[in-house]
């Protein structure tokens, strides 16, 4: 796990080689399962796809919110291994010197799996949480182009690499540029996967020692 802290133009963290081989095996078992028909659903207004105030869809991909999919967290490989983001007293966050990460307190998080193929994108938006962590995964060799993350207010682009995690304040505007894939690689699970974790402080939930 290679952690790099950034301070400009806003505080963020990039972690390369985020998951180890054993964790990746567990994650890919679930991703392959989720790619069966009817598991990951096309983003629509009814399925929870983000939209503009006038009803235009921002999200053009396939997705599923895992917390609502499983009755128990330990039924999901992904929901179990992604706890490492909050482990050891928020060690990943606290090692960053920014006030944002030093003072971060959350007691609730949700996980979404997204999948992008030809022409899929996510137009510029903000997330309704405090902190967002995006982990990108794809099968190698890479069979698509595009799909990088843009932060238009800061003229910044974050490149998508396999097993890379990008952690940043949720109120920063961000989007995904369109993905391009040759026809022979479509519908083969060879696109861009993104595991999104959204953390926030829910004042109705008592803070536990693990969230200090």
Give the residues covered by each predicted segment.
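Eukaryotic charged/polar low-complexity linker/IDR segments
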Residues: 133-134
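Proline-centered turn/helix-capping motifs that create local helix->coil transitions or kinks
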Residues: 36, 100-104, 141-143
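Non-heme Fe(II)/2-oxoglutarate
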Residues: 1-99
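Conserved short histidine dyad/triad with adjacent acidic residue
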Residues: 112-127
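Catalytic core of Fe(II)/2-oxoglutarate
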Residues: 129, 139-212
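Short helix-to-loop capping/linker segments positioned immediately adjacent to catalytic or ligand/cofactor-binding
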Residues: 98-102, 120-123
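A short glycine-rich, His/Asp/Glu-containing loop-to-beta-strand
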Residues: 100-115
